[in-house]
A protein has these predicted regions:
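Exposed beta-strand-loop-beta-strand "reactive/processing" segments of non-cytosolic proteins
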Residues: 1-19
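Short acidic/glycine-enriched loop/turn segments that link adjacent beta-strands
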Residues: 1-2, 48-49, 81-83
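Acidic surface patches and DE-rich sequence motifs
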Residues: 9, 20-22, 33, 69, ...
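Short proline/glycine-enriched turn/loop motifs at strand-loop junctions of beta-rich domains
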Residues: 12, 57-63, 93-95
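Short amphipathic beta-strand/extended segments with alternating polar/hydrophobic composition
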Residues: 17-20, 29-32, 76-79, 107
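Extracellular ectodomain segments of secreted/surface proteins
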Residues: 23-24, 29-52
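Surface-exposed, polar helix/loop patches in the mature regions of secreted/periplasmic/lumenal proteins
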Residues: 48-70
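Ser/Thr-rich low-complexity repeats and stalk/linker segments
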Residues: 64-107
């Protein structure tokens, strides 16, 4: 069980990183995804598509992003409060059934 989340490095830069669940808490895993990287999304090992991802500092309106293929959610990105929001997801429009759902934080 793993998910993607936002992490802030000591130099202040923001990265999208993979977290793995260990003993009921998520811990940072290696191979962090940096701002602007092209990310390959796979479903059961089969490559579906790639998309570019970016983070924008000082923007915390979005709490969570769900990426779905059809009705099936294949990735959930959680954004830590007061960190940043993902502002660009470039999903090729030749893939049917793609959807990106934004969950805004309740104040």
């Amino acid at each position: 069980d793993s998910r993607y989340g936002l992490a802030r490095l000591q130099d202040g830069s923001l990265i999208i990183s993979k977290f793995e669940k260990k003993r009921n808490k998520y811990v940072l895993k290696g191979n962090s995804i940096q701002d602007g990287d092209i990310v390959d999304i796979r479903d059961n090992g089969k490559s579906l598509t790639s998309y570019a991802i970016g983070v924008e500092p000082n923007s915390a309106e979005i709490d969570q992003i769900h990426i779905k293929v059809g009705m099936e959610e294949i990735m959930e990105i959680n954004i830590a409060p007061n960190y940043a929001a993902i502002y660009h997801i470039d999903i090729p429009n030749n893939i049917e059934g793609w959807g990106v759902e934004y969950k805004e934080r309740d104040e």
